[in-house]
Amino acid sequence: MKKMSRWLGGLLAVLLLAGTCAYAQAAPGAVQGSVTVRSAAQSGGMESDELLEGYLYQAAGMTPRVSAAAAAARPALYAVPMQPLTAEVYSGLLPEIREIAAGTRASTQIQVPVSIAYTKEELGVTGTLVADGAITSEANAKISARFRQDLAVDTLLNQLLLRNPYELYWFDKTVGISAGCGISCTGEVCTIVQVTVSMPAAAAYQGGSELTVDTAKTGAASAAAQTAAAVVAGQQGSSDYEKLRAYLTYITGEVSYNSGALAAGTAYGDPWQVIYVFDGDSSTNVVCEGYAKAFKYLCDLTWRSGDPAVQCLLATGTMDGGTGAGGHMWNIVTIGGRNYLADVTNCDTGTAGAPDLLFLCGVRGSATQSYTAAAGGREIRYVYDDHTRSVYDTELELSDTAYDPDAMTPMELLTALTRYVACITDVCPAGADVNGDGQVDADDMTALARTITG
């Protein structure tokens, strides 16, 4: 009995390592076999760090940014048809791929139930399917060719990467995928009931092998998105300015500047910088990229409309002063019709702008040359790099005065005037009492005029 158990255990291990799937319930006299097909490796497209950052946005219900070239290519690629079996396997893979991306599944070897039957006539086998207790070489070759035709693994992989790029941030596309199946043949028909697709994980996400992921890593993005959403939810009912201030305070309270990463020459493009801000771990700190991207992420979560009241952009270039001269990333915040500098990094404890001297502050200079901000008796100089100048236009022109949350914006002035006029001709709406004296009269127009003229 023990010998039989060991034999069965060894057979199971061989089957798992081979990457084949379960066989159909064998009919009397049925003979077993297997087929494996492999896709070509993929290159180009978005890198893993871009995909993870996109997944972070997608996990929060936002649309990730897509390059113009990628967006233009999608309609034609979407139109590529999939064979019925390819489409069936594609549909079966999606729920499992999403679980892997969310950190709730470790294995990247996925079994998809199917129901396939190939008769001798369909396969074009002239001899027998089975002889001497084995599938004949002719039948095996015909089955392999038909399976490769029905399950187009290159098309399958292309469609997965095209339609679900961010959920596959963990996948090593440079290796490709393989698909295997077990075959059960009688004298007249061969059946397949399951296809196993193996999707190797990128080295940065692997668990114990290339066909497993470390769920602590793959679950980090979803957890970060949930934490960020809770931060935003906690500011419901606050004014736009109060929300911005709250996000500044949250970020500088959660992380510190990672001087070690700066010394090591860490390049931009690390999506983990954003995740570290929201992971609740005091040992995972960030450089300027983490501060700036986390601030933008909270803003994007808050103001999602096509014409938001507040817009937050990323700017890269150089900075003299603050945490030191060199490459830097910061934010540009558009609020009240003007653009303001927001350097969250240099508002953290121990920096030149702490706690808020470089947040929505006034600057002097120009977008084409440089901007200089004063902070604690020091002058901090910012210069946009060519990339930032190529992406943005008037958004780079910054206000020379700090944002005043008590001042009325042009839109707010127009709204107040509209309410005042409505009050004269109809029922007074909320906000018509501009000066807050409890009544709507000519004094409110005077208050409006004073606000306009300063």
Task: Describe the residue ranges of each PLM region.
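Hydrophobic/aromatic-rich core segments of domains that either
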Residues: 290-369
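Sec-dependent N-terminal signal peptides of Gram-positive bacterial secreted proteins and lipoproteins
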Residues: 3-25
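Cellulosome-associated attachment modules in secreted, modular CAZymes
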Residues: 19, 23-27, 404-454
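Sec-exported extracytoplasmic/periplasmic mature domains
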Residues: 233, 249-257, 296, 300-304, ...
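Secondary-structure boundary elements
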Residues: 213-280
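Extracytoplasmic/secreted proteins, especially bacterial periplasmic and envelope-associated proteins
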Residues: 92, 152-155, 223, 227, ...
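Intrinsically disordered, low-complexity N-terminal segments that are enriched in acidic
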Residues: 26-198
